[in-house]
A protein has these predicted regions:
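Conserved structural motif at the start of ABC-family nucleotide-binding domains
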Residues: 7-9, 23-25
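Walker A/P-loop
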Residues: 47
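ABC-family P-loop ATPase nucleotide-binding domains
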Residues: 94-156
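ABC ATPase NBD Q-loop/coupling interface
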Residues: 65-81, 147
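Helix-to-loop junction immediately C-terminal to a conserved catalytic motif
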Residues: 54
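The feature captures the beta-strand-to-loop junction immediately N-terminal to the Walker
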Residues: 39-41
């Protein structure tokens, strides 16, 4: 299981690139191991906050700070943020024909390794099958293409 993370947002201000301010003084602290839900009415900034944290190019941070496990999140590239474990899960995930769930997960693990290191295929599949057995999941899910033939909940 990946290590728990802490997220600290202090007085975060952001705007749409070349546009109007959209986040004004957001403060939030999520300690390691806690799970929080960001809730609010349409237009309150939930998606914008998520996109700003992930480094979406349509938004510009104009003030404040954000740290993830003590590291300056705003100084990280989009790629570094994803490798640190920050990502968006879409409400309606797209299907990716031709890419199996197993290959997708292996590629995700590979992306987190230092350059030149490889995920050993035999070890990976052995570990994957073991984890799926622990969770009571049918291993046939690994052979399906990403999100193909899954219910909405399974996709997420």
């Amino acid at each position: 299981m990946p290590p728990a993370m802490s997220l600290v947002i202090k007085n975060l201000h952001a705007r749409v690139k070349d546009g109007a301010p959209i986040l004004n003084g957001i403060n939030l602290e999520i300690p390691k191991g806690e799970v929080h839900a960001i809730m609010g009415p349409n237009g309150s900034g939930k998606s914008t906050l998520s996109k700003v944290l992930c480094g979406h190019p349509d938004y510009e941070v104009t003030g404040g700070s954000v740290s993830l496990d003590g590291q300056d999140l705003l100084a990280m590239s989009v790629d570094e943020r994803s490798r640190a474990g920050l990502f968006l899960a879409f409400q309606y995930p797209v299907e990716v024909p031709g890419v199996t769930n197993a290959n997708f997960m292996r590629a995700a693990m590979q992306a987190r390794l230092p350059k030149g290191e490889d995920v050993d295929a035999v070890s990976f599949y052995k570990e994957l099958r073991g984890r799926m057995k622990q969770l009571g999941m049918d291993t046939k899910f690994t052979a399906r293409a990403v999100n193909e033939g899954f219910s909405g909940g399974e996709k997420k």
